[in-house]
């Protein structure tokens, strides 16, 4: 039985690359769609935010000479491409999905509002909220925090390539140990890179817990939803 009624699932753009160096891996996309469909069939209402790092990153663009605002807008468009791809994969898997955009771009997606997102979820659709916050200088992590708070999600599920939060980067430090749960205060005190500071503080102030888990292992999303203790829970 599902532990959560409504969730905000945050996926990184890089995760959609799968084994590729760039762009979207169709196999990975189909795997994600199948996992999302599985929890949707348990009656969970799902809002999704995807990054755009597999296509373009505004901050790295600024380092290469792009105007930061233009670069961030390019990054927003990258998230829309990823959102359309996931929406298409979900529909192909037999699930109703709708793309909402933080910037007006009909007919590519409908303009986002809290009320539209909640109405769609309550009608059994999966809602993919794209284009970040619609403003430059905000990451998609901040966008996902904002949307999670707005849609009154019970939890933010942050699907990553690692199986939780560690004392240090486990890919670089073999002595790093994993937290099973940790408070927001401890995350901030230790300077752990769960999300950027703005996103973390928003979740803390609005009491939105986060579960950081490995989305690339098939079946993990369902385990999180049913309350199995995988990943790391961040809470007040």
Curated annotation (Swiss-Prot):
Pathway the protein contributes to: Pyrimidine metabolism; CTP biosynthesis via de novo pathway; UDP from UMP (UMPK route): step 1/1
Residue sites binding UMP per the record: 52, 72, 133-140
Pfam families: AA_kinase
Family: Belongs to the UMP kinase family.
Keyword annotations from UniProtKB, A to Z: ATP-binding, Cytoplasm, Kinase, Nucleotide-binding, Pyrimidine biosynthesis, Transferase
PANTHER family assigned: URIDYLATE KINASE (PTHR42833), URIDYLATE KINASE PUMPKIN, CHLOROPLASTIC (PTHR42833:SF4)
List of residues binding ATP: 10-13, 53, 57, 160, 166, 169
Catalysed reactions, semicolon-separated: UMP + ATP = UDP + ADP
Catalytic activity, EC: 2.7.4.22
Entry keyword annotation includes Transferase: yes
Species of origin: Bacteroides fragilis (strain ATCC 25285 / DSM 2151 / CCUG 4856 / JCM 11019 / LMG 10263 / NCTC 9343 / Onslow / VPI 2553 / EN-2)
Chief site of localization: cytoplasm
Activity modulation notes: Inhibited by UTP.
Protein name per its UniProtKB record: Uridylate kinase
Subcellular location: Cytoplasm
Taxonomic superkingdom: Bacteria
Gene3D superfamilies the record matches: Acetylglutamate kinase-like
GO BP of this protein: 'de novo' CTP biosynthetic process; UDP biosynthetic process
Keyword Nucleotide-binding: yes
InterPro entries membership: AceGlu_kinase-like_sf (IPR036393), Asp/Glu/Uridylate_kinase (IPR001048), Uridylate_kinase (IPR011817), Uridylate_kinase_bac (IPR015963)
GO molecular function: ATP binding; UMP kinase activity
Subunit structure: Homohexamer.
Role: Catalyzes the reversible phosphorylation of UMP to UDP.
Gene Ontology cellular component annotations, sorted alphabetically: cytoplasm
